[in-house]
Amino acid sequence: MARRARRPRGRFYAFRRGRWHHLKRLRRRYKFRHRRRQRYRRRAFRKAFHNPRPGTYSVRLPNPQSTMTIRFQGVIFLTEGLILPKNSTAGGYADHMYGARVAKISVNLKEFLLASMNLTYVSKIGGPIAGELIADGSKSQAAENWPNCWLPLDNNMPSATPSAWWRWALMMMQPTDSCRFFNHPKQMTLQDMGRMFGGWHLFRHIETRFQLLATKNEGSFSPVASLLSQGEYLTRRDDVKYSSDHQNRWRKGGQPMTGGIAYATGKMRPDEQQYPAMPPDPPIITTTTAQGTQVRCMNSTQAWWSWDTYMSFATLTALGAQWSFPPGQRSVSRRSFNHHKARGAGDPKGQRWHTLVPLGTETITDSYMSAPASELDTNFFTLYVAQGTNKSQQYKFGTATYALKEPVMKSDAWAVVRVQSVWQLGNRQRPYPWDVNWANSTMYWETQP
C-alpha cells in the first residue's frame, strides 16, 4: 500500500513510483464545490521533452554503522569572461573575441569542498589569480614560510572555464574545520580531501536547492533560463588525447584550462567562456575547384577552443527551462527567482551510497581518490544556465554575447545563485570502540606470566 500524507486545507498525497502524487479531490475552500481544473497535465507535458529524473529503482542495501551530516550554504556569482593578452599576437585577436553568457553548475562533493575553501588563496572569489598568495610570510623560498607557499610568479596566463563555478562562490560548510587553513593553505587536491574525511568510507547526496536571479539587463528582453538535469545531460567528446579524466574529459594544464598557470602563452591559452570562430584543425581538402571563395581555416594554434559543451538559451527553453527576468523588466519578488531542488543520488539503479575512501586504504593518495576507486567527483545533478536576448548571433540561438575585456578591479555578474546543500558521510568500517577495548584487554593474554 502506498504511503500517504496529509497537509493543511485538506490536501492528501500518496507516494507511488518514486514521487509524491497529489490526490485529485474536490476543493473545499469555497462554499460550493468546484471541480479541480486539469491544467493539461503540465508535469506530463514537460517530462515528454525533458525528464530530470528518468526513473527510480530502490535497492535494499545495508545502512552505515555511523553517519555525519554536512551542510553547505552560500552564493554563486555567474560572471562574464575576461581576457589577459600578454603579447602582440593575443592582443590582435583580443578585439575580435566574444563570449557567451552560459554557465554550468555541477552538484558533486568535490566542487562543493572547493567552493568552501579559503577566501585568501589562488583563484577563489573573483576568478583566477596569476600566482599563489602567501598565507603567512614573505620569503622567496617556500620552506621559509608557513604554510609553505610560493610568491606570485610573473608572466603567467591564468584561465578557467564557466564550469568552474566554485571559483566565484562564497560557500560556508557546517561542521567547520578549524585546522583547514593551516593544513591545506593551497587548493585542496583529491588526496587532501581524502585525508580530511579519512575516517569515513561512504557518502551520499541528500538535497540541494538552487535559487537563481537574473541581475543584468541585455536589451529589452533578457531572461535567464535554467534547467536542472540528472547527471551530465550533454556528453562531452571522448578523445583519447584528452580523456585522462573519466568524467570531465580534460587534462590538467591542457585544453580546456582548469585554472592552471604556465610561463608560455602557447602552452596554456585562456579560454574562459570563449567560443572558437570555427573548429580547430579542420580536415584538409586536397582537391580544389575554380568556383567559390577561398577560406582560410584556423588550426589548433590559432583558435582558442574548449571541449566543454553548454546549452544555448533556445535549447534550454525548448527543454522546458524556467525563466528569471532581471530587475527592470519585472518587479522583484519570490517569483523572480528560478527555484530548483535536487534530491537523492538521481540514479535509476538505486545506488544510494557512494565510495568516499576505498576500504583497506592505509595511505591515502591521489590514485586511491581518483575514479573508479573513489566517487568523490561524481556528478549527481547539473544546472545549466544561459541568458537570452532579442539581439544575438544566429548560431548562438538567442544566447546573449559580449566582447571580452581586460580584467578590472570588479566582476560583472549577470546572475546570482543561492545554494543550500545537504550531504551525509557514512562508515561501515570496523572496529567499533568496544571492539578496540576488547582487543586491548585480550591481546596479550598469552604473554602474561
UniProtKB/Swiss-Prot annotation:
Task: Tell me which Gene Ontology terms the entry assigns under biological process.
Answer: endocytosis involved in viral entry into host cell; viral penetration into host nucleus; virion attachment to host cell
What does the UniProt induction comment state? VP1 and VP2 are detected 12 hours post infection, while VP3 only after 24 hours.
Q: Which domain of life is it from?
A: Viruses
Q: Which Pfam families match?
A: Gyro_capsid
Keyword S-adenosyl-L-methionine tagged: no
InterPro entries, alphabetized: Capsid_protein
Its chief place of residence is host cell
| The keyword GTP-binding appears for this protein | no
Annotated region (DNA-binding), positions in chain: 1-43
The entry's localization annotation reads:
Host nucleus; Virion
Q: Which UniProt keywords apply?
A: Capsid protein, DNA-binding, Host nucleus, Host-virus interaction, Late protein, T=1 icosahedral capsid protein, Viral attachment to host cell, Viral penetration into host cytoplasm, Viral penetration into host nucleus, Virion, Virus endocytosis by host, Virus entry into host cell
Q: Which GO terms describe its molecular function?
A: DNA binding
GO terms for CC? host cell; host cell nucleus; T=1 icosahedral viral capsid
Give the span(s) annotated as Nuclear localization signals. 6-47
Name the family.
Belongs to the gyrovirus capsid protein family.
Annotated function: Self-assembles to form the virion icosahedral capsid with a T=1 symmetry. This very small capsid (25 nm in diameter) allows the virus to be very stable in the environment and resistant to some disinfectants, including detergents. Essential for the initial attachment to host receptors. After attachment, the virus is endocytosed and traffics to the nucleus. The capsid protein binds and transports the viral genome and Rep across the nuclear envelope.
Q: How does it assemble?
A: Homomultimer (Potential). Interacts with Rep; this interaction relocates Rep into the nucleus.
Task: List the protein's name.
Answer: Capsid protein
Q: Which organism is it from?
A: Chicken anemia virus (isolate USA 26p4) (CAV)
